[in-house]
């Protein structure tokens, strides 16, 4: 396999943050010697998450075995995932905002056609449903654990407790038609075909669409981590990957 130098479009605070967390982890478990330093392990993990490179390619580039690369990356991802903010913590910080934006996105996977629970009829592909909360400026605040793609957005929001938690905090949420009937403080557009809506309802829907569209940058931010654009791992690991990416994003934006 040929090896070549490559760049990573991340800032040094990402590397310093993860390196420090890995050093703490090594001290906690009493790890003495490893093939890679904490800094190199952090760089390996960031390259995997940001660029989506497979373990074999990364292993060749870092001069380690594929199994070792997998083990190092899994350890670092678990460390990051444990630091991701909970929904309650996000709601507390969002209580000062006028409203939040709620939307769902599908993270495509390489599931086969027989895996019906992971097939999204809306997106016509297999994947995992992740709910996203953003502030009024479109900045990513929180991403939920991943559920099978066949689950509709409103059901996913309920299962994660998003509807009740934000309602209890009195925080208004703007969402699309996929959340119709959610209740609480969720604001959705007027239901019906455009031509059957009154002039006032059409105006409301246009205004609603402009506000709700602000969530798109938050979803795009999540998917700048290229690994999430086409997941080839076990579905049981996807929640950890999403939480790890969320931790790194919030670290870099602070």
Residue ranges and their predicted role:
Residues 11, 37, 196-199:
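Ser/Thr-centered flexible coil motifs
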Residues 7, 33, 47, 62-65, ...:
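Short secondary-structure transition/capping motifs
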Residues 1-32:
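Charged, often Cys/His-bearing segments associated with DNA-binding zinc-finger transcription factors
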Residues 57-74, 78-254:
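Short, well-ordered secondary-structure "scaffold" segments embedded in the functional core
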Residues 15-16, 29-31, 40-43, 66, ...:
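Short, flexible segments with low predicted structural confidence
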Residues 19, 46, 158:
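A cross-family signal for key residues in well-ordered alpha-helices
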Residues 37-51:
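Short, amphipathic alpha-helical "recognition" segments used to contact nucleic acids or chromatin
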């Amino acid at each position: 396999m040929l090896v070549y130098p490559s760049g990573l479009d991340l800032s040094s605070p990402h590397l310093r943050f993860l390196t420090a967390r890995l050093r703490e982890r090594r001290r906690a478990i009493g790890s003495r010697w490893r093939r890679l330093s904490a800094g190199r392990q952090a760089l390996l993990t960031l390259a995997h998450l940001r660029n989506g490179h497979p373990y074999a390619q990364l292993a060749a580039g870092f001069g380690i075995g594929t199994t070792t690369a997998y083990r190092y990356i899994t350890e670092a991802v678990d460390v990051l995932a444990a630091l991701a903010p909970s929904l309650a913590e996000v709601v507390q910080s969002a209580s000062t905002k006028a409203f939040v934006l709620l939307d769902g996105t599908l993270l495509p996977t390489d599931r086969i056609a027989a895996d019906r629970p992971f097939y999204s009829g809306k997106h016509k592909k297999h994947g995992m449903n992740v709910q996203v909360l953003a502030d009024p400026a479109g900045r990513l605040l929180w991403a939920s654990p991943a559920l099978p793609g066949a689950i509709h957005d409103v059901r996913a929001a309920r299962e994660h407790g998003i509807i009740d938690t934000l309602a209890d905090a009195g925080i208004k949420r703007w969402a699309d038609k996929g959340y119709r009937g959610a209740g609480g403080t969720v604001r959705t557009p007027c239901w019906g075909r455009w031509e059957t809506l009154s002039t006032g309802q059409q105006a409301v829907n246009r205004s609603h669409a402009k506000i709700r569209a602000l969530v798109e940058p938050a979803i795009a931010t999540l998917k700048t981590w290229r690994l999430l654009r086409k997941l080839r791992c076990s579905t049981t690991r996807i929640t950890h990957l999403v939480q790890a990416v969320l931790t790194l994003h919030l670290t870099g934006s602070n």
